[in-house]
Design a protein with these regions (language model features):
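C-terminal non-catalytic regions of proteins with extracellular/luminal or membrane-system context
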Residues: 1-274
Length: 274
């Protein structure tokens, strides 16, 4: 009982105090003498809230740009001219981990690029919308779901005109994995897939569904970009099996506006850190 109390009460102290009718302690400094003391320490450096927000956005973009790493750029394929249209492949493109207020489509269009509208709508509102990564650990270990659940190539091919919409575009395969605080990844995929050949794989490598899509892209396009969206290091030993993947770029957790910086790296307006 004592052990349970020591474990459960501290993180829920405010709730326990409320139930017992206790008040949290505090310090009344209203009678403190302030003569000769500058009480306006920490003066705001902005005249308006809008100016503060603009500065926060600029800082977010700067930090994101400096954190993005260009891991591979064979033949100098990147940067791209802004008359390029990109096809963002995988459900992770529309559910980018750690990118919230500005999505990939908006960021790249704002940078002057074209974005494959048919493919974007397929993942965001069409027959590809119900796929995507599991949440990882639930409530710090109460349960876990590390399923990958990527939309299969067969579903993409069954959609009239979808694969044709990718012609004359540069495909960007978004490879995402859930990782971070409270999300210890599984040693294998045994409990997170029904596909036998994937059960012995790790979470940090592509599963059979992803590999089938990557093979299709490799066979049908001469320039493919691999975009990594993971806060954990991933296994990239397989990349050499797909010679059409000329560019690999790592852009984990971009924050609210960081995808704008990613688009500017694709255009050459910003430089990645590596």
């Amino acid at each position: 009982g004592m052990v349970a109390a020591n474990v459960l009460i501290p993180p829920n102290a405010s709730s326990v105090q409320s139930i017992l009718g206790l008040k949290s302690g505090g310090i009344d400094n209203s009678k403190a003498k302030t003569e000769g003391i500058n009480m306006e320490y920490g003066k705001p450096g902005f005249d308006t809230e809008d100016a503060l927000v603009e500065d926060e956005i600029a800082l977010n973009k700067q930090i994101a740009a400096e954190g993005i790493v260009l891991l591979k750029n064979d033949e100098g394929r990147m940067p791209y001219s802004t008359d390029t249209t990109f096809s963002f492949v995988s459900h992770s493109a529309v559910s980018y981990i750690g990118g919230n207020k500005v999505d990939m489509k908006t960021a790249f269009e704002d940078a002057g690029f074209g974005v494959n509208e048919d493919l974007w709508k397929f993942y965001s509102e069409g027959n590809g919308k119900d796929y995507g990564l599991g949440v990882g650990s639930v409530s710090y270990g109460d349960d876990e779901d590390f399923s990958i659940n990527e939309c299969p190539l067969s579903v993409m091919k069954a959609e009239p005109g979808l694969t044709d919409s990718m012609k004359n575009t540069v495909p960007v395969f978004v490879f995402s994995r859930v990782a971070g605080e409270g999300r210890d990844m599984p040693r294998s995929m045994y409990n997170h897939t029904d596909v036998e050949e994937d059960k012995t794989k790790t979470y940090l490598e592509p599963d059979s569904t992803e590999l089938e899509i990557l093979q299709y892209l490799n066979d049908n396009f001469d320039d493919v970009v691999l975009l990594l969206n993971s806060s954990a290091a991933v296994d990239l030993s397989w990349v050499e099996d797909y010679p059409s993947i000329h560019t690999v770029i790592s852009a984990p957790a971009m924050g609210d506006y960081g995808l704008c910086s990613l688009a500017e790296i694709f255009s050459g307006k910003a430089n990645p850190s590596g």
